[in-house]
Amino acid sequence: MCIRDRGKLKELDIPFMYVGDYLEESPLGKAEWLVALSEVIGKRAEGEKVFAEIPVRYNVLKKKVADNILDAPSVMLNTPYGDSWFMPSTESYVARLIKDAGGDYIYKKNTGNASAPIDLEEAYLLASQADMWLHVGMANTLDELKAACPKFIDTRCFRGGQVYNNNARTNAAGGNDYY
């Protein structure tokens, strides 16, 4: 729903709230949205309890990685959408997740606060230099990724099988915990 539609929602007395978790630059800031969403369903105390444990666990893992990483692997993200490939900002929560997990986000040009489109040629160059490739759209297998991005099968990360998606838990409609 567009922001301009909020007047209609008010007119119809339909409650609404804006959820801006996608604007968060910190993974912990993004996680904290569970408190706001818990409030919506009348379970704020439970949301606060769950969230209180997240920073502790996150920071323990972050320190464990920092103490053990010798050489940060370069990380490529995403797949094309139409003729563009959208790359997150270096200040985004996903870039921060990569850093905190011991990786090096490969796209350094976008320092703004939103994802930026790049052309497929630049994406190919980045993927060719990357040690691993994450968030590969709807692809569940390398064969599915090959069908979606046939020009990228000769990149180092594809050839080496260093391609990972955030689809460990999905429902029948394809939804998952990440999105």
Q: At which residue positions do the language-model features occur?
A:
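Loop/turn elements at helix/coil->beta-strand transitions in domains of secreted/extracellular proteins
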Residues: 12-15, 37, 44, 69-75, ...
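Conserved small/polar residues in nucleotide/adenosyl-binding loops
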Residues: 1-3
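Extracytoplasmic/secreted envelope proteins and their assembly/folding machinery
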Residues: 6-9, 31-38, 47-51, 55-58, ...
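Structured C-terminal subdomain patch of bacterial secreted/periplasmic proteins
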Residues: 24-48, 135-179
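Internal alpha/beta domain cores that form substrate/cofactor-binding pockets in large enzymes
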Residues: 5-27, 105-112, 118
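Basic- and aromatic-lined ligand-binding clefts that recognize polyanionic substrates
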Residues: 46-101
